[in-house]
Amino acid sequence: MTAQVDRKHLMTSVEMAHFVSHGAIAFEGVVPDELNRRAIDVLDAGIDPVPYGTPLDVAFPEGTFVRELIDLPVVAGAIQSLVGPNPHIDHHAVHVRPPRGGEAQNMHGDAILDTRRDAFDAQLMYYPREVTLEQGGTLSVPGTHLRRINQTGIGRYQNLAGQTRLTCPAGTVVLLHHGIWHGGRRNDSDVPRYMFKIRFNPSVRQLRLWNTDDIDSDGVRRELTRQFGWTNANEGRLELVNRAKLWRTLTGDENFDIDYYLTRETLRPQFIAPGATDVRLGASHAANGWGH
């Protein structure tokens, strides 16, 4: 992963805009069947933990199963597009739900008082087998990743507007913003459900890490203005502001806006008008010669 990924395998600007609005992006069925079959034995045996902040190349050396997975071009390209070429491993975990077993998790976000607004972690979720509704695919609420919560602070809420349940074919990889609201479901099927998660920390500034050839595409704005079941008129406008702020951070374009929201926030003129009623204020020097 230390090597730069070929540009053709990086995410596009439209895909990045989708991630910014949804808080997730899925790559369905991209892992080869042979790797999916091997994954079951690997996950059953468990994968040794690593200390927080371990460089990727140290955590998953070449020749390991996980390295083979994340070196797949589409997966490597997505990781680099989100967190850069040399991310660190925050942590990883194997999640296996037995048949007819487990309990549904409360809704939560994988972040405790994470105040970063100019960076984010990416979480990879790999599903080596098909996930059906009966198997209890991960529940999430698209677009909630920019609404800051303290991990399980929303756990008492159920059946949120706009929530979705993941179903996917074998070999699917999903990448999430660390702040998205989600929760695992119980498995009501007769087969175990497998998922492997890795959380990546960026080690470089997250600035135009993807393929920006289509950055002026109309599709970018369409993705950034997507609405969900919970984004009514009031909440929807606030979410457009949140997305525009993140897009400015990711692109370095400090003039980008959706509608006029962020531009309006900058309207704080310092020029004192001629004839200000409080003589203690004086007038800006540039007003001299205006008359009256």
Can you say where each PLM-predicted feature lies in the sequence?
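A structural signal for short, well-ordered beta-strand segments
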Residues: 92-94, 124-126, 196-200
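Short, solvent-exposed loop/turn segments at secondary-structure junctions
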Residues: 148, 182-184
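Short hydrophobic-aromatic micro-motifs
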Residues: 26-27, 126, 174-176
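Non-heme Fe(II)-dependent double-stranded beta-helix
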Residues: 1-116
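Non-heme Fe(II)/2-oxoglutarate
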Residues: 185-292
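Conserved metal-binding segment of the jelly-roll/cupin
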Residues: 167-182
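Catalytic core of non-heme Fe(II) oxygenases with the double-stranded beta-helix
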Residues: 103-167, 205-214
